[in-house]
């Protein structure tokens, strides 16, 4: 089944042409409880991990195995993120235990699916893994959407547009920040779903601002962003509980070799 986000009831760029140059494409993954295999893109599902490679272990927790979080084949990225040359598979894992100043410790791997060969089964997670830090297995339903900055809107522009934001909300009931700009949920590309001031990282190598790669979110949608197919339907998703219903935001530098990664937490 596909998932389709209802179109916004107003033309954002017509009302606020100043945000048009800041538009970004994102892919809402719409994870829903299921039984994916390693042949599928998934959230919390089995990874197409080569048997010849050791399973990643956390360096801070006595070699505790990392948990599979997201697997995405290039076909399901819908062109939003350019994969490294010869790669068509993105895999994200993390150690779900608390770390010094961080909620989780993630790793990002790019690989060629056809070169994997025999697939290694993930080791079981240790007892005491925090509840809500590892997603339940979900199939995904990739959907291409357009986003505009919310918390990432530059302060001078926000101040200039705020009277029009207020006018549109008064006339339509639609708030720019929560209804018209940035989609909630687990997604590729676009803007992070910040709940407060942005913590956009710079690359330690080149010093440039990093690109948003992926948001892994506790909540998938509110009423305004619920797909048509889920309206009035009770559904199960990844059952994550990251802090106070927050999210983990992964960033990468696409200019430096190896595409180094940093993460941020937001609630």
Locate the predicted segments by residue.
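Preference for intrinsically disordered or flexible, low-complexity segments
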Residues: 1-267
């Amino acid at each position: 089944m596909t998932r389709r986000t209802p179109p916004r009831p107003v033309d954002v760029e017509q009302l606020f042409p100043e945000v048009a140059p800041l538009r970004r494409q994102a892919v809402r993954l719409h994870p829903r409880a299921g039984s994916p295999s390693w042949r599928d893109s998934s959230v919390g599902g089995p990874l197409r991990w080569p048997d010849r490679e050791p399973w990643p272990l956390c360096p801070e927790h006595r070699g505790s195995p990392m948990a599979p979080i997201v697997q995405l084949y290039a076909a399901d990225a819908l062109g939003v993120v350019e994969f490294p040359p010869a790669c068509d598979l993105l895999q994200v894992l993390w150690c779900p235990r608390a770390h010094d100043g961080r909620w989780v410790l993630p790793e990002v791997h790019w690989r060629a699916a056809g070169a994997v060969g025999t697939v290694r089964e993930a080791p079981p997670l240790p007892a005491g893994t925090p509840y809500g830090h590892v997603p339940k297995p979900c199939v995904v339903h990739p959907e291409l959407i357009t986003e505009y900055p919310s918390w990432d809107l530059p302060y001078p522009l926000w101040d200039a547009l705020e009277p029009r934001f207020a006018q549109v909300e008064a006339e339509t009931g639609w708030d720019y920040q929560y209804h018209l700009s940035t989609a909630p949920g687990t997604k590729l590309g676009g803007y992070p779903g910040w709940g407060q001031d942005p913590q956009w990282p710079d690359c330690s190598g080149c010093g440039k601002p990093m690109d948003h790669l992926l948001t892994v979110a506790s909540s998938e949608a509110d009423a305004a962003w619920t797909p048509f197919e889920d309206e009035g339907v009770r559904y199960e998703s990844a059952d994550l509980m990251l802090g106070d219903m927050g999210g983990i935001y992964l960033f990468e530098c696409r200019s430096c070799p190896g595409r180094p990664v940093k993460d941020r937490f937001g609630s």
